[in-house]
C-alpha cells in the first residue's frame, strides 16, 4: 500500500527577522538608494518599458529613467504584502510574503555532483531525479524548475523539458523561465494545460525570478519576460545580479 506523502505547511515566523544592522543604518541605505535612482537613474532598454515609465510620471531621457522617491514608494505600496501560490495539489498550496517562510530548491545550477564526488554538467535525467526528490521531501514547499540545467537539450526547446519535468514529477508549486518572451509565454501556456486557462487568469500558479544587470540596467530580455508574467497576473521576484566582491562590495551591508 502506498504511503501518504507528508508535506510541511507554510511556516509562519513568530520571532523578528535577523537584523544585520541598526534601523538607522537601514534608513541610510534606503536614502542613498533613493538618491541613486533620483539622480543617476536606471537604464531600461525596452521601448514599451520606457513608455510605461513616462506614463507613470518618471523623468525619462532616452533609455535612462530617473524615479522620484515619492513615485517609487507609491508604486511599491501597490504590491500586496503576501499572496497565495497555488499548487496542482491544493494540499500543497503555500503563502508567500509577510511572516511566511517557504523552502525551495536552488535555481539554475549548470553542474551536479554525484555521490562518487564527480562534478559534471547536469542532464535531463538528473533534473527528473531532483524534481522527484523535491516532491518527496516534506521540508520543501516547491519543486522550483531549473534545479540543474539539462545541458544535452538544445537551448531553444530546453525550457519545455524543464517545465514538463517540474509538472510531471511533482504536484508542488513550481517556478517559471525568464530567458525570453516566447519561453515565458510557453510556461504560461503549460500552466494553462495543467490548471486550466481560466484558473491561471485569476490565480497565481507560477513565480519567476528576474535579474537586473549590474550596474543599474534592465535589459529587453528580462523586461519582456516580466511583462508576460505580469499581464497574466503571475508574481515576480525582482533581484539584483549581485556578486559580492565582484559586481558589489564584498560586505553584506555594502552589497545591499
Question: What is the meaning of each model-derived region?
Answer:
Residues 122-256:
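Helix-rich catalytic cores of soluble enzyme domains
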Amino acid at each position: 500500500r502506498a504511503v501518504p506523502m507528508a508535506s510541511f505547511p507554510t511556516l509562519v515566523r513568530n520571532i523578528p527577522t535577523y537584523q544585520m544592522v541598526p534601523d538607522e543604518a537601514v534608513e541610510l541605505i534606503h536614502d542613498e538608494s533613493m538618491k541613486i535612482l533620483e539622480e543617476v537613474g536606471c537604464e531600461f532598454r525596452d521601448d514599451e518599458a520606457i513608455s510605461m515609465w513616462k506614463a507613470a510620471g518618471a523623468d525619462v531621457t532616452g533609455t535612462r529613467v530617473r524615479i522620484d522617491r515619492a513615485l517609487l514608494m507609491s508604486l511599491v505600496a501597490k504590491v500586496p504584502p503576501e499572496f497565495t501560490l497555488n499548487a496542482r495539489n491544493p494540499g500543497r498550496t503555500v503563502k508567500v510574503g509577510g511572516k511566511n517562510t517557504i523552502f525551495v530548491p536552488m535555481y539554475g545550477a549548470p553542474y551536479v555532483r554525484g555521490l562518487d564526488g564527480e562534478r559534471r554538467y547536469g542532464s535531463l535525467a538528473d533534473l527528473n531525479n531532483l524534481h522527484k526528490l523535491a516532491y518527496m521531501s516534506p521540508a520543501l514547499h516547491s519543486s522550483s524548475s531549473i534545479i540543474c540545467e539539462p545541458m544535452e537539450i538544445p537551448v531553444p526547446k530546453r525550457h519545455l523539458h524543464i517545465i514538463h519535468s517540474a509538472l510531471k514529477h511533482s504536484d508542488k508549486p513550481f517556478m517559471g523561465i525568464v530567458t525570453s518572451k516566447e519561453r515565458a509565454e510557453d510556461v504560461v501556456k503549460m500552466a494553462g494545460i495543467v490548471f486550466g486557462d481560466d484558473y491561471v487568469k485569476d490565480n497565481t500558479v507560477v513565480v519567476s525570478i528576474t535579474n537586473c544587470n549590474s550596474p543599474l540596467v534592465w535589459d529587453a530580455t528580462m523586461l519582456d519576460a516580466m511583462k508576460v508574467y505580469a499581464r497574466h497576473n503571475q508574481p515576480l521576484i525582482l533581484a539584483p545580479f549581485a556578486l559580492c566582491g565582484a559586481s558589489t562590495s564584498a560586505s553584506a551591508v555594502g552589497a545591499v
